[in-house]
Amino acid sequence: MINDGGAKPETLLRVAEIGGRGRSLVAAQSLRAGQVILRESPLLLYSAFPFLSSSVSPYCDHCFRLLASSAHQKCQSCSLVSFCSPNCFASHTPWLCESLRRLHQSSSSAFSDQPSDRQVQARFLLSAYNLAAASPSDFQILLSLQGSGSSNGDPSCSAGDSAAAGFLHSLLSSVCPSLPVSISPDLTAALLSKDKVNAFGLMEPCSVSNEKRSVRAYGIYPKTSFFNHDCLPNACRFDYVDSASDGNTDIIIRMIHDVPEGREVCLSYFPVNMNYSSRQKRLLEDYGFKCDCDRCKVEFSWSEGEEDENEIMEEMEDQDEQEEMEDSVGENEEEVCGNGVDDESNFPHAYFFVRYMCEKENCFGTLAPLPPKTHDASRVLECNVCGSVKEDEVGVNQ
């Protein structure tokens, strides 16, 4: 259900410095539930499949739609990538083709003692190097993103990251054809750091039988990377990778609920149902910071500090208990959506889970209203993971 709503991000959002959070995106005007505030195409995309994967990627190596079993074009030069159309095949540059061929020839021995993630990082670097040659202006945008690759000035950079950068730079510089641009070890480290903190995963199709979905591809979206994290976000991202329309790899950012002018707009960097300790561990390891959002402050104060929200959500499936929560916490939505803490409640974000968490099995997606077509907000909520829609029963009953 793609609808860009005529969004003009330069009029809807502005960059601001917020104490303790750094560069942030805040509402430049009042934003409405369901409003599309940003639609962005990727700066680059790359496959999430390792070179030595036992399974062949079923996706086009440019747009990452599912390939039709009979109608796809395989590169005859490297035999390593397939495309769904001549237009997608045209994106496969001679340098990238030859680099993939050479790297694949040496991959069995080169990556034998390396984790599989190292092969995916190599894919990113090849895409980044290719961007440097094909579009220097876009490469400069990539370089402007957060992530320095230096353990001294980059909290997300670890000793393991530095070792990975050294290994990959040595391997690729010895295997790949020369480029018209110079790639130094420091630049390679910086690129890997930028990928680590800015890449967004494009997921495989949702399935009830597949509780842990895999990523089909990663993309760099410069404007979207400006959004800070909050464990109770007021916006969420949608993508429609398998749609037949143009721009299928675009990321669409949509408001979950109304936000006043001047309020920071935040995304959650992972499924909202994760418990406190898992969230903190992932944020520290992947992004280099400890979250102290309103939800984390409340959960930290709990006696064990690591309540499993999945169990809480299962308990909330009881209808009487759910209605009681809606009555007690549904009066002021903004207080429980990253905007404040109700000190009188042991679980102040219950309202968010009741209204904005997808209830389908093994989904764990976030619900947001469809883009409003009139002055009134839509009463239909869409899941950003499984794509299902439902009537906003909680909002209707307010």
From Swiss-Prot:
One annotated GO biological process? methylation
- Give any Pfam family that matches: SET
By its UniProt entry, which InterPro entries does this protein fall under? ASHR2-like (IPR044238), SET_dom (IPR001214), SET_dom_sf (IPR046341)
Q: Where is the SET domain?
A: 11-270
Question: Has keyword Cytoplasm?
Answer: no
According to its UniProt record, where is this protein mainly located?
nucleus
Alphabetical GO CC annotations of the entry are: chromosome; nucleus
The record's similarity note reads: Belongs to the class V-like SAM-binding methyltransferase superfamily. Histone-lysine methyltransferase family. SET2 subfamily.
- Report what the protein is called: Histone-lysine N-methyltransferase ASHR2
What is the protein's species of origin? Arabidopsis thaliana (Mouse-ear cress)
